[in-house]
């Protein structure tokens, strides 16, 4: 999967609509680049937004405690407390709506646009985030919501856990991959390098060898 474009609007420290287009210069021809800035300028927000669009989950919401709404980026005073794991808390303070759109192309050449959005209802409370997945090429069609996450998982080729251990590593999370169990680490590497086929072949050969040995043993027993 290759990310083509990211558009964010009113998410934490990112105010208004901002776009990062990897299909346009200077990023198009850049082999390697860095996103830099002061603490709190929105670098991690970009990574979180990508995860929200693809999985409705993000590293900043993992393993955190309940905290007062005022300490989150909420725009309402009516919600006394929310779960810090609630992805809606990424909405920038003072704004009525925020969203992210990620356009990406799969290894099969199919192009999709995944969007995630959140808004404030008339009552002043935060509405549940909304998601949409649209296939842009080779055909233009909106993916049924019931199939949305399964379609993204298949298109990306990674689950959220795998994605955040290999493609996007949150702050202080590089050790997650290193701490992974050997079997999990091997499975991840196989999936990323496309070599899982060799494990399947190896298992097939092993089963055939076992069957052949059993047949030989049966024949030897019959001849005695």
Predicted regions and their residues:
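Extended, Lys/Glu-rich alpha-helical coiled-coil stalks
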Residues: 34, 38, 63-72, 140-143, ...
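Extreme N-terminal "head/tail" segments of very large remodeling/mechanoenzyme assemblies
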Residues: 1-150, 154, 160-162
